[in-house]
């Protein structure tokens, strides 16, 4: 009963608010009231904390008392980004009619739902970073995933196992992920809780619905033209994204012109561990420099975003890689052309996001002027590219669209100094619309206009004292003294008689009066209509502008590679069809930029092949530079296959299809996993996925457990890699100098060490990779350099001598004898039964088999052995 009374006492405004809020229960509702956006209840409490605005009460002391917090409507671009960045979905509820035109409560409705993954607001977006919305679809064997950046129109889809989808999520780093409600736990188990997720009804994730949604949007009969028709789960996830756009009131999305397949076999495989370990975009230390920080010399937002994509997806196609290298070589040899292209790229605004705003109808007059200026800057780039003898550059020049009609239309329609909002006025140029020009003349030069009429009528009638005036009763009128009454023309209409004069009105004055009183309102209306027409007309150029944006981004990335090569003395890598990796004087691209001025980076050679030196076993103490050598090898390969030059004297290499790293400590305590467990998970992932063109980098395997356990595990892993048919190229860094013994029985393992000079009381890290193993770890020396108390150092030295005396290499001999006895290699079996078991095991799909099926298979293998 009390609840009913409360409802009855709701004000009309709060009743309207509650009706709208019920439609958007999970969003923060910004409710337009007059000149303010207000929030109520729980929304107000959250908003006041996030925005730092005053929390007050509406209807204080009454039954309808509720929390209230608000801000001026013109501050929306200041406060909205803060709410979205805090992870909130924000529903913007505007007044849908002029309050002056209604006697009842103003009609209101949600005009836009802004979420972390769906926004066109410049303050929410980062210029050189895509703002992806992702959607995942779970099936029995595959997981589908799609990514959309509504601010640029990029729409991508893929499908695969959980590991592949995890890699894509790490690479694309979406701001928001859509998940079916019945798959909450599956998503959390597979990909963790780091993503901002939103759960959709399960019926949305149906193939028929997705196909209908996508074909309707693209206005096609099928999706064959996009090359995605076989990606069933990918298509379903993409359909959910388009559904979500319509739900968030983003219905004007004609800038989403295509959906592109992420071709797994076209790019180098890097799992999440590798992406993290190599510090491509993020570092363990928030203040540290990443590879992206070093290589990003792009000058446009589009170029910056594309460079991130190239870094995430290095190429495997030799011809495409060599094509990029050829452009960099050409630009490096022609510095003047490089400088001229870069100068023009600097003049180009964010074409992708500008044209997306035009499609959505959320663009300002000034932004359209920026669009025109950007297209102007493309003309000299096109000319330079067409004159180039380099074929790939010439193709870019040929493909760039000059957009002559579009540029001319904007030039003649808008003022060069157009305002940031159409409501500010003076956006449309003079000469576009006759009525607009006349209204402006009336509005800005009314006095001159009236003086002109006064002068003309005085000359026409011969009444020299004729005067035009204004009052609130008659409006504008002509006053004539009685001495000149006989000269008044017949068409003048008398309105008032005074003692010494008569007042008249004319049709012309009445028209002028009507015009001037409504001029400002009409000017705004005409300008808005003309601007809307212009925006709709420009929208027909979406595809050529998007193509221009992509081509400029490509050129920008290649110029960035060239700039980097010039500044840092990078060389062009030689790509061939061998399985070799031959680096002469390679350098770490990030570390060399962090060294003090004048300090040279110690360069190192690395050679790997499948015949003589498949595995390099690198020993040396901590701090000696082992990890840096591992990382720089991976980064050189990565840069080469991105199409960049590389930090070395020379590099010759066959294509690498997968890069695996297990580098440095990376506890996942939040997931309840220790260092050792994380290490074993990462290493297992590597061993289960290697190929004949893989590059494997292992650092300090086994250090998270006891010494003997660690040595045993490291030994077994190294032998597995050596004996595996793929013979994957491997760098294996360890401080277990016992592993140097492996070269005696495994011919493709070669020992190297990072040179250290032992001085009187300290060690000098030379950081040079030299052939041969290292017999000492120098751990106590490192502890001393770190400032450990002398008492601790002395005690450690005594204990070390005692341990070295008491513990010979018995443990190592035990490992070697076990090796001889058990034939640790599982790939050299002569027994037909064991060969059969080997085939059984190798044919198993670990990712697809259930625990019960695994036990049944194990029981089957046991029966085979018992029979024997």
From Swiss-Prot:
Residue sites binding ATP per the record: 620-627
Lineage: Bacteria, Pseudomonadati, Bacteroidota, Flavobacteriia, Flavobacteriales
Pfam families per UniProt: MutS_I, MutS_II, MutS_III, MutS_IV, MutS_V
InterPro entries (UniProt xref): DNA_mismatch_repair_MutS, DNA_mismatch_repair_MutS-lik_N, DNA_mismatch_repair_MutS/MSH, DNA_mismatch_repair_MutS_C, DNA_mismatch_repair_MutS_clamp, DNA_mismatch_repair_MutS_core, DNA_mismatch_repair_MutS_N, DNA_mismatch_repair_MutS_sf
Name under which the protein is recorded: DNA mismatch repair protein MutS
Coiled-coil annotated spans: none
Function description: This protein is involved in the repair of mismatches in DNA. It is possible that it carries out the mismatch recognition step. This protein has a weak ATPase activity.
Keyword DNA damage: yes
GO annotation, biological process: mismatch repair
Similarity comment text for this entry: Belongs to the DNA mismatch repair MutS family.
Keywords: ATP-binding, DNA damage, DNA repair, DNA-binding, Nucleotide-binding
GO cellular component terms listed in the entry, alphabetical order: cytosol
């Amino acid at each position: 009963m009390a609840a009913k009374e409360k409802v009855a006492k709701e004000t009309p405004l709060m009743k309207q608010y509650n009706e709208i809020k019920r439609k958007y229960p999970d969003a923060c509702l910004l409710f337009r009231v007059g000149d303010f956006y207000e929030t109520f209840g729980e929304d107000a409490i959250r908003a006041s904390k996030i925005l730092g605005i005053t929390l007050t009460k509406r209807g204080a002391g009454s039954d309808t008392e509720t929390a209230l917090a608000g801000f001026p409507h013109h501050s929306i671009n200041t406060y909205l980004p803060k709410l979205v960045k805090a992870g909130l979905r924000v529903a913007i509820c505007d007044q849908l009619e002029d309050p002056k035109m209604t006697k009842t409560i103003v009609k209101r409705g949600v005009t836009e739902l802004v979420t972390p993954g769906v926004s066109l607001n410049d303050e929410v977006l980062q210029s050189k970073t895509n703002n992806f919305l992702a959607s995942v679809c779970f099936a029995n064997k595959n997981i589908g995933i799609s990514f959309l950046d509504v601010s640029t129109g990029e729409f991508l889809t893929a499908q695969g196992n959980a590991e592949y989808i995890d890699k894509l999520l790490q690479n694309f780093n979406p701001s928001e992920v859509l998940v079916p409600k019945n798959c909450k736990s599956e998503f959390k188990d597979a990909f963790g809780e780091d993503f901002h997720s939103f759960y959709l009804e399960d019926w949305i994730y149906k193939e028929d619905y997705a196909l209908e949604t996508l074909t309707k949007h693209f206005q096609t009969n099928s999706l064959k033209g996009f090359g995605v028709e076989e990606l069933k789960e990918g298509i379903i996830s993409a359909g959910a994204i388009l559904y979500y756009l319509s739900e968030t009131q983003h219905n004007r999305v004609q800038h989403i012109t295509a959906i592109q397949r992420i071709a797994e076999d076209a790019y180098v495989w890097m799992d999440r561990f590798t992406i993290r370990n190599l510090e491509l975009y993020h570092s363990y230390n928030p203040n540290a420099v990443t590879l992206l920080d070093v290589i990003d010399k792009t000058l446009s937002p589009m170029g910056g975003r594309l460079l991130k994509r190239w870094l995430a997806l290095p190429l495997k196609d030799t011809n495409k890689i060599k094509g990029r290298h050829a452009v960099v070589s050409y630009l490096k040899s022609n510095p003047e052309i490089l400088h001229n292209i870069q100068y023009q790229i600097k003049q180009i605004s964010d074409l992708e996001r500008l044209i997306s705003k035009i499609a959505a109808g959320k663009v300002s007059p000034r932004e359209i002027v920026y669009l025109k200026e950007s297209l102007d800057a493309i003309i000299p780039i096109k000319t330079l590219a067409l004159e180039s003898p380099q074929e790939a550059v010439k193709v870019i020049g040929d493909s760039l669209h000059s957009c002559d009609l579009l540029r001319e239309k904007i030039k003649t329609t808008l003022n060069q100094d157009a305002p940031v909002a159409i409501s500010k006025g003076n956006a449309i140029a003079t000469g576009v619309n006759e009525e607009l020009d006349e209204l402006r003349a009336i509005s800005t030069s009314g006095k001159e206009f009236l003086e002109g009429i006064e002068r003309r009528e005085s000359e026409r009638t011969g009444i020299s004292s004729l005067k035009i005036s204004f009052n609130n009763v008659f409006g504008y009128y002509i006053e004539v003294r009685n001495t000149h009454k006989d000269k008044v023309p017949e068409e003048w209409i008398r309105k008032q008689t005074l003692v010494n004069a008569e007042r008249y009105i004319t049709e012309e004055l009445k028209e002028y009066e009507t015009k001037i009183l409504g001029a400002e309102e009409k000017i705004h209306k005409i300008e808005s209509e003309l601007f809307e027409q212009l925006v709709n007309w420009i929208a027909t150029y979406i595809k050529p502008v998007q193509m221009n944006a992509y081509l400029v981004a490509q050129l920008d990335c290649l110029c960035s590679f060239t700039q980097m090569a010039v500044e840092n003395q990078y060389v062009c890598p030689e790509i061939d069809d061998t399985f070799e990796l031959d680096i002469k004087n390679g350098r770490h691209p990030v570390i060399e930029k962090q060294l003090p001025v004048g300090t040279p980076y110690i360069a190192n050679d690395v050679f790997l092949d499948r015949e003589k030196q498949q595995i390099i076993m690198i020993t040396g103490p901590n701090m000696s530079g082992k990890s840096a050598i591992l990382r720089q090898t991976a980064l050189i390969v990565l840069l080469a296959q991105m199409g960049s030059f590389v930090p070395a004297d020379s590099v010759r290499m066959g294509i690498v299809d997968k890069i695996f790293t297990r580098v440095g400590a990376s506890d996942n305590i939040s997931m309840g996993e220790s260092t050792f467990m994380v290490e074993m998970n990462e290493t297992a992932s590597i061993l289960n996925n290697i190929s004949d063109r893989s590059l494997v980098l292992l650092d300090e395997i086994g250090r998270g457990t006891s010494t003997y356990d660690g040595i045993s595990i490291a030994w077994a892993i190294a032998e597995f890699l050596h004996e595996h048919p793929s013979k994957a190229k491997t760098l294996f860094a360890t401080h277990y100098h016992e592993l140097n013994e492996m070269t005696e029985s495994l011919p493709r393992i070669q020992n190297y060490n990072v040179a250290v000079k032992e001085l009187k009381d300290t060690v000098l890290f030379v950081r040079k990779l030299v052939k041969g193993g290292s017999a000492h770890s120098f751990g106590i020396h490192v502890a001393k350099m770190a400032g450990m108390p002398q008492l601790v150092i002395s005690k450690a030295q005594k204990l070390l001598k005692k341990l070295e005396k008491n513990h010979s290499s018995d443990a190592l001999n035990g490992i070697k004898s076990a090796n001889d006895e058990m034939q640790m290699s599982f790939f050299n079996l002569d027994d037909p039964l064991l060969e059969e078991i080997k085939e059984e095991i190798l044919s198993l799909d670990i990712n697809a088999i259930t625990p019960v099926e695994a036990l049944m298979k194990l029981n089957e293998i046991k029966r085979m052995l018992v029979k024997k």
